UniProtKB/Swiss-Prot annotation:
Reaction equations catalysed: tRNA(Ala) + L-alanine + ATP = L-alanyl-tRNA(Ala) + AMP + diphosphate
Cross-referenced PROSITE patterns: AA_TRNA_LIGASE_II_ALA (PS50860)
Cofactor: Zn(2+)
Organism the protein comes from: Clostridium acetobutylicum (strain ATCC 824 / DSM 792 / JCM 1419 / IAM 19013 / LMG 5710 / NBRC 13948 / NRRL B-527 / VKM B-1787 / 2291 / W)
Compartments where located: Cytoplasm
UniProt-recorded name of the protein: Alanine--tRNA ligase
Main EC class the enzyme belongs to: ligase
Length: 881
């Protein structure tokens, strides 16, 4: 067994199974497609579920992949051990009703012993208790010594999760001991497994049963094979190391971290944990961003933010003061670009996203850490070991601290978070709630009836050239059951042999319209694809009934379709204009097209200037006025790329693609509907440009009559402003600037008067100074001033009383503003403005806090202000030492 690099192992595995007539598929995106049960792809078979369930037809019955995966279930332990990571690659070979146990076992043995040349006396096999068939193949076909095969129960060697496809599995294990002797008993085998001296490296799943709701195991007509071998795990064996962080490609990343922070790996346990966390997380972060995931406060974007900020925080603990993670991703990309070409194609984009997020975290880290330190000090003073969830949520919501990061920091101090309280706060902000999980079985989410349409059902789209056609009803579904009739007043699903209705896809909404037959009429409220691409019409029967097998006429709402076409073609032209005006780095990140407007999300890191927006808009309108023919051509993907056609990075295209061209101005791969000539769009108007995430901008625009209406409304608004300001259009800005100048002068005069008013309060306030245990304090209401003036007055009074605390309050209707300040000596004696003001504000229905020497707060119930101010003395007595 010779040393083998990680990249070489990957290639040898995939090449081996290509020779066994497997189709090598590229890794699927980390973002699951049509599977809400998963946040991120976490297993090699996960993207292949539709093939295993029969919902989609695989491109070949034999497939092999190396799938990028992410698991974050035990993220808090990542770095503490040297064996686990959040990012990993899973090698797999799969059969969809083709070969079964004999072939997969024989090939697994051949690859391990003849290609990788594992010593046979270090290999052990586990099988399911009564899987005699697998035992026979291992011993008779592969020639494995029966004493090296152990049988285990369902917990270890049977793959199932709820109902659905399942089956026994067989695992291959490697004995890592320096001088291995034959393991003779199951007990000894388990003992060595627990010590990680015997490790599992390949799992062969024989999916031969379908478990029903009653728990019965029914034999599948066409059994499948699902295998998984962790690339990093097999690399540790081939490179004779116990740690994934010692593997060639990963060690190179770790060494780069060491170089940045000038720390040597292996000399200090705490430093080693931080080094491993950064090394692991930058790999996950790089691949996630490459697949289109961006930092956010929900879903997979939250996972990314959590990983990125955890890595950045551990960089600080190693003494790294500058942003550094974007540089590390260069090392990740260098080592992985051979297998994942998209990494190099998007390298600048990935680095920009990382740098922006790291800088944002850097900006809030110091203030957030200061707040957290205050919380920890408060808990220490009160001798408490549990921090409220409300405080943890504030750090999360205001300072971008993932709660797990706060937990990690607090754990070092022996403090916990009240997570029930935290989740309660999270629930209050539903717009930031995590993605809800759906109940799922082994193959993912519960399969809906629309995804179980018989293979004989075909739906042909004929809507590129027509908005009306006659066809036959193939399937009717109502209340998730196949039916023969849908009656007036009922809703359901209609599937026909042919349809002119475009099904929602690629950002374009589904068509609306009507379906009518001899006995009734149905309104089509939406049109979608099921998981296998069959077109389904979601309908409401408004007259009579629609029956299965009857001939019907399908008519798309022509006006809505035409407006959708205008907006879709305009979206293509917008992207082309953005690339020309802003830069070639612009790529589509998302889009939405309906009959009223269009929305286009694209990769860019700063807001567009007014000049850029005007240039883009003018360019699109120039091309509209040029009245180019819009052409569509069908060609191979390679041919399309040679023409310069734009495509989405994460989209999987078939062998033949549809290319839509607007003259020579725009050329894109697209399956949507478009105008025949750019002149049909009429007018294009950008109505907004904004940021939606780090590195993602959004343009919203309108076309045709909507754009004309919008322009007319703006003209009317300008006319009204002219009348109000009594000036012409060209003088509006001058008039507004004049009013601004006058307003500023008035504000200056008001502030001078407020200052004089505040000075008049000083004497009254100073006359009411009291004392607690040698510390002076004053709590007073002042009328008619607020904001900066109130703070300035508080500061003056504090300086006048020399050694003490001042709390001032001002009412505006029922609202109350509080400011408190204390001298250094008063703080040393126990005064804490943040604690004082928090209690006082809470009595007035408000909240707030701050530092020991300065704090601010607000209240909602002004009637209770007098009572609250009287309590300041009692609060001071509790604090002063």
């Amino acid at each position: 067994m010779k040393y083998m690099g990680l990249n070489d192992i990957r290639e040898s595995y995939l090449s081996f199974f290509e020779k066994k007539e497997h189709l090598r598929l590229p890794s699927f995106s980390l973002i699951p497609k049509n599977d809400k049960s998963l946040l991120l792809i976490n297993a090699g078979m996960a993207p292949l579920k539709p093939y295993f369930t029969g919902l989609q037809t695989p491109p070949k019955t034999r497939v092999t992949t190396c799938q990028k995966c992410i698991r974050t279930g035990d993220i808090e332990n990542i770095g503490k051990t040297s064996r686990h990571g959040t990012f990993f690659e899973m090698l797999g070979n799969f059969s969809f009703g083709d070969y079964f146990k004999e072939e997969v076992i024989s090939w697994a043995w051949e690859y391990i012993t003849e290609v990788l040349k594992f010593p046979k006396d270090r290999i052990y096999i586990t099988i399911y208790l009564d899987d005699d068939e697998a035992f026979k193949i291992w011993t008779e076909k592969a020639g494995v010594d029966p004493s090296r095969i152990f049988r285990f129960g369902k917990e270890d060697n049977f793959w199932e999760h709820g109902s659905g496809p399942c089956g026994p599995c067989s695992e291959m294990h490697f004995d890592r001991r320096e001088k291995p002797d034959l393991i003779k008993t199951r007990e000894k085998f388990i003992e060595l497994q627990d010590k990680d001296e015997v490790i599992e490296f390949w799992n062969l799943v024989f999916t031969q049963f379908d478990k029903d709701e009653d728990g019965n195991y029914n034999k599948l007509k066409n059994p499948n094979i699902d295998t998984g071998m962790g690339l990093e795990r097999i690399a540790t064996i081939m490179q004779n190391t116990d740690s994934i962080f010692e593997i060639d490609t990963i060690r190179e990343v770790l060494d780069a971290v060491c170089k940045i922070c000038n720390v040597k790996y292996g000399e200090n346990h705490k430093n080693d944990v931080s080094l491993r966390i950064i090394t692991d997380h930058i790999r996950s972060v790089t691949f996630m961003i490459s697949d289109g995931i961006l930092p956010s406060n929900e879903g997979r974007g939250y996972v990314l933010r959590r990983l990125l900020r955890r890595a950045a925080r551990h960089g600080k603990t190693l003494g790294i003061e500058k942003t550094f993670l974007c540089g590390l991703c260069d090392v990740v990309i260098k080592n992985s670009k051979g297998a994942y070409k998209e990494l190099e194609e998007k390298q600048d984009y990935i680095k920009n996203v990382i740098e922006i997020e790291e800088k944002r975290f850097d900006e809030t880290l110091d203030s957030g850490m200061e707040i957290l330190k205050n919380y920890i000090d408060e808990l220490s003073l009160e001798n408490k070991k549990v921090m409220s969830g409300e405080k943890a949520f504030r750090l999360y919501d205001t300072y971008g601290f993932p709660v797990e990061l706060t937990q990690e920091i607090l754990e070092e101090k022996g403090i916990e978070i009240d997570m029930n309280d935290f989740h309660s706060e999270m629930e209050k902000q539903k717009n930031r709630a995590r993605d809800a999980r759906e109940e799922s079985n082994y193959m993912g989410k519960e399969i809906k009836l629309i995804d179980k349409l018989p293979e004989s059902v075909t739906t042909k789209f004929v809507g590129y050239n027509s908005t009306s056609t006659d066809s036959k009803v193939e399937v009717l579904i109502k209340d998730d059951e196949f039916v023969s009739t849908i009656n007036e007043g009922e809703s359901g699903i209609v599937v026909t042999e042919e349809t002119p209705f475009y099904a929602e896809m690629g950002g374009q909404i589904g068509d609306k319209g009507i379906i009518f037959g001899k006995n009734g009429e149905a309104k089509v409220v939406d049109c979608k694809n099921n998981i296998s691409g069959k077109i389904i019409h979601i309908v409401q029967v408004v007259k009579g009934s629609i029956e299965k097998n009857e001939n019907v006429t399908l008519e798309v709402n022509y006006k809505k379709r035409k407006d959708i076409c205008k907006n879709h073609t305009a979206t293509h032209m917008l992207q082309a204009a953005l690339k020309k005006v802003v830069g070639s780095h612009i790529n589509q990140s998302g889009s939405y097209v309906d009959n009223e407007r269009l929305r286009f999300d694209f990769t860019h890191f700063t807001a567009l200037t007014d000049e850029e927006i005007l240039k883009v808009e003018a360019m699109v309108n120039d091309e509209i006025m040029a009245a180019y023919d819009v052409k569509t051509d069908i060609m191979s993907v390679d041919e399309a790329k040679k023409t310069g056609a734009m495509a989405l990075f994460d989209e999987k295209y078939g062998n033949r693609v549809r290319v839509v061209s607007v003259g020579d101005f725009s050329r894109e791969l697209c399956g949507g509907t478009h105008v025949n000539n750019s002149g049909e769009i009429g007018l294009f108007k950008i109505i907004s440009e904004s940021g939606v995430a780090a590195g993602i901008r959004r343009i919203e625009a309108i076309t045709g009559k909507e754009a004309v209406r919008y322009t007319e409304e703006n003209d009317n608004l300008i006319r009204n402003i002219e009348q109000e300001l009594k000036c012409s259009k060209k003088d509006i800005l001058n008039k507004i600037n004049q009013y601004h100048s006058e307003l500023k002068e008035k504000e200056k005069e008001i502030n001078i008067l407020k200052g004089k008013l505040a000075s008049g309060f000083e004497e009254n306030i100073l006359s009411s100074v009291k004392e607690v245990s040698g510390v002076k304090y004053v709590a007073s209401e002042v009328k008619g001033i607020s904001g900066d003036t109130l703070r300035e007055l508080c500061d003056k009074v504090r300086n006048k009383i020399d050694d003490g605390m001042v709390l001032l309050a001002s009412k505006d209707g029922e609202k109350v503003q509080f400011v408190a300040m204390a001298s250094k000596n008063a703080v040393k004696k126990g005064v804490h403005c943040g604690k004082v003001i928090k209690e006082v504000a809470s009595m007035c229905g408000g909240n707030g806090g701050g530092r020991p020497d300065m704090a601010q707060a607000g209240g909602k119930d002004g009637e209770k202000l007098e009572t609250a101010l009287k309590e300041v003395g009692n609060i001071m007595e509790k604090l002063v030492k």
